Each structure stands twice: as structure tokens, then as C-alpha cells.
Amino acid sequence: MTEGQTSNVPFEGVDSCGCGCGCNREDLPWSGRGTDLPITGCRFSLYPMTDDFVSIILGALDKTDASFVWSQSDALSTVYRGKREYVIDAVAALFANAWRDGVHMALEGQVSRGCPGDVSGDSVLSCEGEAPNAATVEAATQPALAKLSLYPLGVEDYIDDIAKVWYLAEERGLNPTSIHYATRIEGSIRDIFTYFNDVCALMEQTVSHYVLHFTINVNSPTDEEE
Amino acid sequence: MTEGQTSNVPFEGVDSCGCGCGCNREDLPWSGRGTDLPITGCRFSLYPMTDDFVSIILGALDKTDASFVWSQSDALSTVYRGKREYVIDAVAALFANAWRDGVHMALEGQVSRGCPGDVSGDSVLSCEGEAPNAATVEAATQPALAKLSLYPLGVEDYIDDIAKVWYLAEERGLNPTSIHYATRIEGSIRDIFTYFNDVCALMEQTVSHYVLHFTINVNSPTDEEE
């Protein structure tokens, strides 16, 4: 694991995690937490903008193999936790499986790893081999738009990381543009999620705690030439 | 303005803004940025889960007075920028104006202030007085669910702030619960957005740069007692 992180010890130093740290505050519900395990999580919500949204979501869940991740849903969102590549694989596949021609749909998500408020449980880390939905994701060539906001936490010198993430988007032909509070990209569903996976992989190399917030949408009716 | 922030100078020290800093990197599009102005922004997307989503969104935009903020929309999201209370007022009113009985709808947003990659333009800061949609927001008593993830950036000692934000939710009767990567709350549309406004006000007192990511939804078909 990366520097500064041991189980059940508050993350000292320059961390500024906002998802609820305070591991040494006994009055807060996340008191005493922390994990050494390489758990990546993605909390996300799927929004098909159609009267038929329930069956689209349930249908997509049926087709998606989420056996390589731990999962929990509530009335607001679902969270997958486990090895990063399998978490991204499952989210990408769910989105691809929910795609329906002509239906405008978005997925809003946050990928998080290394939060000092995290726990060692609620995860699956025992799987190996090819991601179970790899073929589905590979076939997801439908065009999509996306935006991302990346928070590398707890490090002073993060500019090179941010630059790498920008250049990676350029190299991948995702046409990044800078907008207030985010970076916008465009590409296929497959290429965008592959990029998110690689952004996360980059972050793992240099920061112990990061959060990537993203939106991806398809079949938008908005005509931006207007 | 708060410590460490002057125009066009990179934020030194422990900042770990991920929305694209690197003000001294001439190869990046946000080179040379920074602002002293008290601009708060909210980038958000509205998701009515119905075939009728376009007319719901356009209808809500028609009814919402966004004259106290600067605004720009694209195919993914809209951003409002200006004084915090007016930004939150406009977003809350848009959501309240879009509410339709029986229609499941969500709004996903990020409130941001103090990013060293920010600019002084694209904002309205000249307005005073009562927020233009105050009556609409006050009347928004419909029940809603929400989650929030708060990132106070650039400070070492933020735990007290996070604790205050948690306790504030308890005091307001919003029944906060800790979930992976976020805090969940429930209350009326009005009370939830009032809370978001107050969280942002708290953050302004102690950190120069924060981001609050949130989701709010209404009329969810999910039965959590199952």
C-alpha cells in the first residue's frame, strides 16, 4: 500500500478526504476505520430518461455479471467494491447493457480508493483472470459524451498527474476540453470506460487516496451547434 | 479572500485540487488562472426519468429565475456561477419547478469554490437582496432523498469541519447515515438545499477551496424495506 496508510490509524498529514474521515473521532460513525486492502469502489446511479426506466435498469442488471465485485443498492445509488479493473468492468457493462437506441441515458459515478474512512469488508478481492464482462464492454462502440472531475487527495505535487490524465485523453482521441470544474471528453462507451480505468491506474501509482467523479451520457437530444 | 490565494498564482502548499490546476503549466489549458473573486459555481444535470423529460426540463427552466447567476449549458450539464446563495437558490428552484407528481427525478451536482484553476469571468456578482426564487424554494416541501460527498481541499485539519457538517444534518432532522463514499440524508427539497447552502457557508469559513458533490432524488420507486 502507499505511504501514510495503516489500518485503523488516521491518515496524518496533508490528506483532505471529504467523504467522512475522522478515524480518531469516537463521536463520528467512521471512527477507527482505515484499510490496507487495495479496494476500489464505484458508487453510481443510472438514469434512463424514459417511462420504461425500471425495466431498462432491471434488464441491464440481469445481463451484467457482477460476481467479481461486492455490490449494494439503495434508493439513490449502487456501489461496487473490489479490484479496480473488475469494478470498472461491471459499471461499464451495466451501462452498455442498458443502452437502447434512441433512449437518452446517463450514468453518474464516483470511483474512490484509499479513503481513510474506508473499511476492509464489503469487498471481493479473490477473483483473478479476465473481467467477466470484457466482451460486452469491447463491443460497446456506441458514441458517448462524458465529463470528469478528479481529486487526488493528500499530495502536494499532483500537477504532473493531472497533466498525464489530460494528455492521455488527447492520445486516446477523446478530444478533451476544459470546462468549469471538469474536463469534458467524447468517444465510444468502451473507450471512455477504458480511459477511466487507466486514469484510476495512474492515480494508484502516485496517490494513496483519490476520487474520480464522472458523468457519461448517450443519445443526447441537445444540439450543440445551436 | 482566504489564505494562499492570489490571482494567477498557483495555489502553493497542500492543495490537491483535481479539477485541473497547474496554473504555472503553460502546456495546460488552465495555465495562468486563479481568481480572488468570491465565485461559487454549481455544475449540475437534471434527470427526469420519463419520456417527457425534455418538456419537464424546458418548463422548469422557464419558471426559474436565473438572472442572479451566470449560466451555460451543454449536452452534459449546466453550470451556474455567482454568489453562493443565488447559485443554490437557482438550482433548488429548478429542481422544485421540475417536480411532477409520480415522476422519478434526480439532480446530480457539484458545488465548487476556490479552485486555483478558476477564472474571474463567467460570473454575476453584482446582485443584492432576497434570492429571486426564495418563495419557490420555501414552498418545496416535497420529500426527497439525497447523498453528499464533501472535499475540503488544501487543509490539513479538516476533521472539525466534517464533524460540523454531520452534526448540522442531525440538528436539521435530516437523519444522516454513513454509506461508502458518501453521507445519505432525507428531508424536504427545501430543507435539503438549505442544508447544502449552509454546508457551503461553513466551508467558506475555513477552507479556500472545497467541492461538494451531491445527488437529490424524488419519487423513487425503490422500496427499501424489501
Task: Please provide the spans of the model-predicted regions.
Chain A
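Charge-rich, low-complexity N-terminal segments
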Residues: 3-226
